[in-house]
Regions:
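Positively charged, Gly/Ser-enriched RNA/tRNA-binding surfaces
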Residues: 3-14, 18, 33-174
Length: 174
């Protein structure tokens, strides 16, 4: 969730350069680097613990309870966790929650995301075949105000996954 990252950055008082460094560490899954960076920041224990959750991979929405209790004094972080809990409730209603995991450290190089950011994987694929997220302000660049959600299918990864799964698609031509 983009707001989780932004809320942490705001609460820690990170400048733009520090935020970029943290983004790069997270993008490279360098959680030791994140820990080292956080140790040098002189943060309170609660914020340190929240930063440590950037490397967590929760398989059930209930596992976000620890993050929620820690975030009680940080409204932006709490709002992000609440959004994820709501998503978890919808997933449960449709019986598909077992197919979704929550990763608090997922970020995007696209800074326009304001909400949930997602990646989709399939069997035999270590790379996402779909990526996307919510952006509330992107369309203002084009003179329109509207919340939106979008995604992209990564064709190369999708084709590789189909090949690994030995799924052949017949293309009809007229």
């Amino acid at each position: 969730h983009a707001q989780f990252f932004r809320g942490l950055a705001e609460a820690a008082g990170l400048d733009e350069e520090q935020q970029q460094e943290l983004r790069e560490l997270l993008a490279n899954k360098n959680y030791f680097g994140v820990e080292e960076m956080v140790e040098g920041m002189h943060l309170n224990d609660t914020l340190k613990k929240l930063f440590s959750l950037l490397g967590s991979f929760e398989t059930q929405v209930e596992e976000l309870a620890e993050a929620k209790s820690l975030a009680s004094d940080y409204p932006n972080i709490l709002s992000a966790i609440t959004d994820l809990e709501k998503l978890g409730s919808f997933l449960r209603l449709y019986g598909i929650e077992k197919y979704v995991s929550f990763e608090l450290g997922i970020i995007s190089n696209y800074h326009y995301y304001t909400g949930i950011i997602f990646s989709g994987y399939t069997f035999g694929s270590g790379e996402p075949i779909v990526k996307g997220g919510r952006y509330d302000k992107l369309l203002t660049y084009y003179g329109k105000t509207s919340a939106s959600i979008g995604f992209a299918i990564v064709i190369d990864q999708l084709m590789a996954a189909l090949s690994r799964q030995k799924i052949n698609i017949t293309i009809e031509t007229n």
